[in-house]
Amino acid sequence: MFSPVPPCIREQIMKRIPPFDGIRWVAFTHFHEDHFDLDLVNRYLQEAAPEMLVMPEDTQYGVSSKLKAGVCSTEAIELPMGQCRSIRLWETGSLTAFPSRHAGREYEKVSHLCYVLEADGKKVLILGDSDYDSVFFKQMAGAMEFDAVIANPLFLHLPRGRRVFAQSIRTKEIIFCHLPFAEDDQIHFRNMMSEDMKQYCHP
């Protein structure tokens, strides 16, 4: 259903070839295989030696015990719903994590984090595979306005997802991710997204 990172780009990341040469921090929203590959992450930690890895605390998959972090600092975050934790990255940059439910009742026990990246006066909200809960995001976002939100296409396709942006999250831009490449798109996700953008996205 979803596309893996193409091998050529994956190798550029591993070998820190520009534009992937300045990565100092790595963060994961959750550990589903379309977001996280333990072998590739361990290889990257060994070869690129980033400063910090941020991820949910996890008991379902036991990821922490399988990581080969080396000199990389590991922040495994476990918080009650509704709370957040901020990590200072540099003088004008921080990463704030807060737990959210994963979309889909079958995934309700999956450890999942959203992130707010603040850098040089800009704020970006990363939703991962969050549930489409406008009440929850109104509580977490408060009066904040984001410069961009990174969301999966179902936030546009589903009425519940659209309500999150209509009622709860204020943002200048929405960046949609998690789209398969054309050759992998067996369920016509790209066509769905194209039609949704025509219908719901207006200048």
Describe the role of every protein-language-model region.
Residues D21, A48, G93, M144, ...:
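Structured loop/turn residues at beta-strand edges in well-structured enzyme cores
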Residues S86-T96, E118-V124:
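Beta-strand-turn-beta hairpins that frame and shape the catalytic cleft
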Residues F31-L38, T59-V63, R85-R88, R105, ...:
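Active-site environment of divalent metal-dependent phosphoester hydrolases
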Residues M1-A27, D39-R43, R105, D131-M144:
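Pre-active-site segment of Zn-dependent metallo-hydrolases
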Residues M52, L67-E91, K138-M140, R163-P203:
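Binuclear metal-ion centers of metallo-dependent hydrolases, dominated by the metallo-beta-lactamase
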Residues M1, G22-D34, V54-E57, L125-S130, ...:
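Active-site neighborhood of phospho(di)ester-bond hydrolases with catalytic His/Asp-centered motifs
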Residues I13-R85:
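Active-site HxH/HxHxD metal-binding segment of metal-dependent hydrolases
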Residues D39, R101-S168:
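Active-site-proximal loop/helix segments of hydrolase catalytic cores
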